[in-house]
Amino acid sequence: MEKRWIDISQSFSNKIGTWPGDTPFQFEVAFSKEQTGSVNIGRFTTSVHTGTHADAPFHFDSDAPTIEQLDINVYIGRAKVVDVTGFETIGREELQAFELDGVERLLLKTAKHVCAEQFPTQIPVLKENIGAFLKEKGIFLIGVDHPSVDALDDKQLLTHHALYQHGVHILENLLLQDVSPGDYELIALPLKIQGADGSPVRAVIRAM
């Protein structure tokens, strides 16, 4: 029997948690079938950093590539999920405990429960030294189950910059609470939005 794909994306709804001060997600039926005579037509507004999304380097570096300029092959392929639940900070020292040889995409499961409708007040933080460590291992994509790889109130974003400097791309707000550690196929394609600093993704995995 073929193994099933698992959706690890947050659902967009008008109640989804949003970064404080950012554009909240809103969907509405702008024109109903009764109005048009043939179809319903929906309309939505959102920040590109709401829900499960990919960061483009342009998000934190005005001279760096935007989302449509990134290689889509980064977001398709074999990935490894590791359980780092309980760590307040995650870097070289914490990840050295895992077998990561041959891994190219790494998804970090840090939370036992995620509520997409509540923006968190505290999250695990990735250390700046994780960028060099991932490059040494040949990993070019890191995914986390919270809104940022840096602290929520951090303005320097040193980990974002360190990851970019070492060729590591970022996925945020994955849903991994019900996913077991192991090897998976991953598809998490960003939309082709010209000039954008990020994009929502529909992230799915399938056990290898």
Residue ranges and their predicted role:
Residues 1-208:
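Active-/binding-site microenvironments in catalytic and ligand-binding cores
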